[in-house]
Design a protein with these regions (language model features):
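Alpha-helical transmembrane segments and their membrane-interface boundaries
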Residues: 1-115, 120-148, 152-156, 319-484, ...
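Long, hydrophobic alpha-helical segments that serve as membrane-spanning/inserting helices
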Residues: 1-14, 25, 29, 50-51, ...
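Elongated alpha-helical scaffolds
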Residues: 90-94, 237-245, 612
Length: 716
């Protein structure tokens, strides 16, 4: 069935709205408004751990969620008020659940939800309430939300996957538009800055692709493959192919802009890339509307105009760089062909082979592999372990403060610290500001609620609206979500018969204390800046690019042209590790005083590394053409030089300067020999591409050696 033309945020919030509305109706019918708080908190907990999956996968997730929530809620409830046993129980649960996140996204999500439920249990405690009431109501809320999400999945089974694929095309559209800036001849002198901008944009593409891959992975695990899921898989593969071709670099952009700045070809390519970016956005819009993408005839005329301009340019100019422009246009033509195929659903036959439609596993996948995933993380070099220890100490401190001072409603401190303390210093600092701002504003607005909503019914409507708005805003604006959840919390306290005005200053003070604990923890307990290992991230990036080049060389040698799961996984790792380098530098840039000596070589590494990934991707686009014109002598020598280049990249982090120079001299000799065997157009193109790749070796190695306190290590 067709998905209604509703905003994605509204669609994803419908299960929450339905759940809270049902809970409020039940509470109103029973005449027990004090049950609203634990009931709604259970719904919120269920929403926090909700992960898209096929129907049977969701049912398994619900069972695991209820089991974990039962354990954490009963543990918190049974030890609450006992002093040291409660502090120990909460601390151990925090460490255990957080370190479990090392297994994968699913376990990390469930573990955080279990910690949230334990905290919710402490928040809803009152001495006069039977001890099982609040844990039971929290679990009822979780089950109610789970039931609602199952119903909505039956009604709109493919909406989450469509939204994930649409987000991937939106991100890809932004990436294409960023790539278009490379073809602005008036900005040729500042192309180095464009590389950094493009790398940052690429991080968003990789994130969107990974979310899309995750959604498809869980939908494809069953034996039956729904036609709509298969269609989304084809769209995903098309996006991957477009990304590889657009991220490829066939020429030195600065040199090309200088040489062709007075011709119209540069401006035409710039316009074509912008139009292809818009085509990606149009694809995203079509997916969200459950319609087929309609290919724009203007796009076809634009690519034909580029080709005509190139023909006229080549007729009047014997510049050898013309052939590189021709290869660039051939690549853009392949992107255009992908859009044409999307309209006609022409990828069906190409991608329905089983070997082409597998997706690499996302995580270890089962509990039996849990220890194998956790064991390597049990050291301070692991960000997961540092976060687990840090968060455990924060929880212990918060619980100790509340228990020692016997603070009324004091567990808001624990809740704030738990949600604000992130593995990353920059993210935590941002959340501290947003949490405090959202809470203060929420308290101000919440103080007006009793004047305008004296009845139980209107207060329940406030709870419904604020909870729904919390979920609508939590993924993109944390201060807004904090604002809405503060209003919800104060209204729930009012429904429970507590003095809201007495709770308001407590809420603000507790938020400040909890946020301060989180900030102090990430600032002084194994702070991130001591472990922001630019060296390791750069090593992983260059090694994964070497593996990517090696995989392409194998394909060129064997003549294979398909993108099987192994090739896609290798390509994805190269892009992910390059994106990780971008993220690391972004974090370091927020603390320039601490990383002053590392930032300059870091940005050189990013610019060079991103160019390297682009040149390797371009070589990957030639996989089907190696044997068309190349002589056997050229082919053999090309494989030798390419394999040697890949080997140098893969072992670059551990190579000493003298050994690196020897290897580089040997490679240059191999490339000189290869040049003597280069005769046809195709061999010239392949030679030039390999030379562009090899050209990145020296600047990358030089920048890598300039990283302060560098120690030899093997990142491979």
């Amino acid at each position: 069935m067709k998905t209604p033309l509703l905003k994605p945020l509204l669609i994803t919030s419908l299960p929450v709205f339905a759940s809270v509305f049902t809970a409020a109706s039940i509470v109103w019918q029973l005449g027990e408004p004090k049950l609203a708080m634990p009931f709604v908190l259970g719904i919120i907990a269920g929403g926090l751990v909700d992960l898209d999956n096929r129907l049977t996968g969701r049912l398994k997730n619900i069972i695991a969620t209820v089991a974990l929530f039962t354990l954490s809620s009963l543990t918190a409830q049974s030890t609450l008020g006992t002093g040291l046993p409660f502090i120990l129980a909460m601390t151990l649960m925090t460490f255990g659940f957080t370190i479990l996140g090392a297994v994968g996204l699913k376990y990390r999500t469930f573990a955080f939800g279990a910690l949230a439920v334990a905290t919710y249990t402490t928040l809803t405690y009152t001495p006069e309430t039977y001890w099982l009431t609040n844990p039971f109501m929290i679990l009822c809320g979780t089950v109610l939300y789970s039931t609602a999400i199952i119903i909505f999945q039956i009604i709109l089974p493919h909406r989450p996957v469509q939204e994930s694929v649409a987000n991937a095309y939106d991100a890809l559209g932004g990436y294409l538009e960023a790539k278009a800036d490379f073809f602005d001849p008036d900005e040729a002198a500042w192309i180095g800055n464009r590389h950094i901008d493009l790398a940052m944009s690429n991080t968003g593409v990789i994130t969107a692709f990974n979310q899309c891959r995750s959604a498809l992975f869980y939908r494809l695990r069953g034996k039956h493959r729904h036609p709509r899921t298969a269609k989304m898989l084809r769209y995903y593969f098309a996006a991957q192919d477009i990304h590889e071709r657009i991220s490829s670099a066939h020429v030195d952009y600065q040199e090309m802009s200088e040489k062709f700045k007075n011709t119209d070809i540069i401006f035409r390519i710039h316009r074509l890339l912008e139009m292809q970016g818009q085509a990606c956005r149009n694809t995203a819009q079509a997916l969200r509307a459950s319609k087929d993408y309609v290919y724009s005839k203007r796009l076809g005329r634009a690519i034909e105009g580029c080709r005509q301009s190139l023909r006229l340019l080549s007729d009047s100019n014997d510049n050898p760089d013309i052939r590189h422009l021709r290869r660039l246009l051939d690549n853009l033509g392949s992107v255009d062909q992908q859009f044409r195929q999307l309209q006609h659903n022409g990828l069906q036959a190409e991608n329905d082979r089983m070997g082409d439609t597998r997706i690499a596993a996302l995580e270890t996948g089962s509990l039996k592999n849990t220890w194998q995933a956790i064991r390597p993380q049990l050291n301070l070099e692991s960000g997961v372990f540092r976060h687990a220890v840090r968060l455990s100490l924060v929880v212990a401190a918060a619980c100790t403060i509340v228990e020692a001072l016997n603070l009324n409603l004091g567990y808001w401190i624990l809740l704030t610290a738990l949600f604000v303390c992130q593995p990353n210093y920059t993210a935590t600092k941002s959340r501290v500001r947003q949490r405090i701002a959202g809470t203060v504003l929420g308290v101000i607005v919440g103080s007006l609620v009793p004047y305008f909503t004296p009845s139980v019914e209107t207060k329940l409507w406030i709870v419904i609206a604020s909870t729904t708005l919390f979920f609508m805003t939590r993924t993109y604006k944390y201060s807004f979500s904090t604002f809405f959840i503060t209003i919800q919390a104060l209204t729930s306290l009012s429904l429970a018969g507590l003095d809201v005005y007495a709770a308001m200053p407590v809420r603000i003070i507790d938020t400040i204390i909890g946020a301060s604990l989180a900030w102090a923890a990430v600032s002084y307990l194994w702070p991130d800046w001591k472990y922001l290992t630019l060296e390791r991230t750069a090593a992983l990036a260059v090694c994964s690019n070497g593996a990517y080049l090696e995989k392409i060389t194998e394909r060129l040698k064997s003549g294979e042209t398909g993108d099987d799961v192994e090739y896609r996984a290798t390509r994805r790792r190269a892009h992910e590790h390059t994106a990780a380098l971008s993220s690391t530098l972004s974090d370091m840039s927020s603390e320039p005083a601490k990383f002053a000596d590392s930032l300059q070589p870091g940005f050189t590494l990013l610019k060079t590394g991103y160019a390297l990934t682009g040149y390797i991707s371009a070589l990957g686009a030639y996989r089907s053409e190696m044997h068309e014109e190349c002589s056997p002598d050229f082919t053999a020598q090309f494989h030798l030089a390419a394999e040697h280049t890949a080997h140098i990249f893969q072992h670059l982090p551990e190579t000493e300067p003298d050994d690196f120079q020897t290897a580089l001299d040997t490679l240059r000799g191999e490339l000189d020999t290869l040049r003597t065997h280069s005769s046809g157009t195709q061999s010239h193109i392949l030679l030039q591409q390999l030379q562009l790749i090899a050209r990145q070796l020296e600047p990358y190695y030089r920048a890598y050696r300039q990283i302060p306190h560098r120690q030899p290590q093997n990142a491979a």
